[in-house]
Amino acid sequence: MFSTVTITASDLDASRRFYRTTLDAIGVMPDAWGELRLRAAGDRADVTTGLHIAFVTRSQDQVDAFWRAGVDAGYESDGDPGRRPIYDDDYYGAFLLDPDHNSAEAVFHGRERVGPALIDHLWIGVSDLAASRRFWEALAPPLGLTLYGERPERFHVRDENRSFALVADGRQATRNLALAFPAPAGAERVDATDPDGTTVTNAG
């Protein structure tokens, strides 16, 4: 789905240590981080906050290893390993907070996801669901996306393989995230910023 998901960190070295510690535990070395990008905050980019990012795993044991590696390294748990039937009958996940308090999850769906993508899904907090819906409705065609599954507090955006959710359930709005998508053939160029400060392009 994503060409890149770029998180801007207040302390780049600290964020690299967090993601290396946790992703190493599920067998993903930095040269295989794929669509995940980290960059330092500065004059041209503010810190990413309020993001939930979930990573694909191949087993419940890998989910446990992700969480244990983070906790043993001193990172804060955001949810112990376990089943989450509220999401799906075979959903098994564990959650940690990165150095900027973004929520990072390892998830196993009871079956392997198809394809090489590292990121399973994102939850992006929004301050105004109606405004965010209008934003994504306008961008859906040139990004090759579909909106679906609307509920009072959230809706989902997907392509053929993956999805992400825009959520207005009282959580902090996601700020200063950068998303790049592959452009469908013949699509117009997109460079836009959502109402809460996430930048979106199909030039990735």
Which residues does each predicted region cover?
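Short, conserved, surface-exposed binding loops centered on an aromatic residue
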Residues: R113-V114, L147-G149, G170
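Ordered, small/hydrophobic-rich secondary-structure cores
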Residues: V5-I86
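Vicinal oxygen chelate
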Residues: F2-S10, D46-A69, V71-S127, F155-H156, G186-G204, ...
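Short glycine-/small-residue-rich flexible loop motifs, especially phosphate/cofactor-binding loops
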Residues: R20, W67, D98, E137, ...
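Short, well-ordered alpha-helical segments in soluble proteins
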Residues: G74, G110-R111, W123-V126, G144
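Short, charged/polar, Gly/Pro-enriched secondary-structure boundary elements
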Residues: D43-V47, N102, N161-L166, Q172-A173, ...
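Core segments of cupin and vicinal oxygen chelate
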Residues: T6-A41, G125-F164
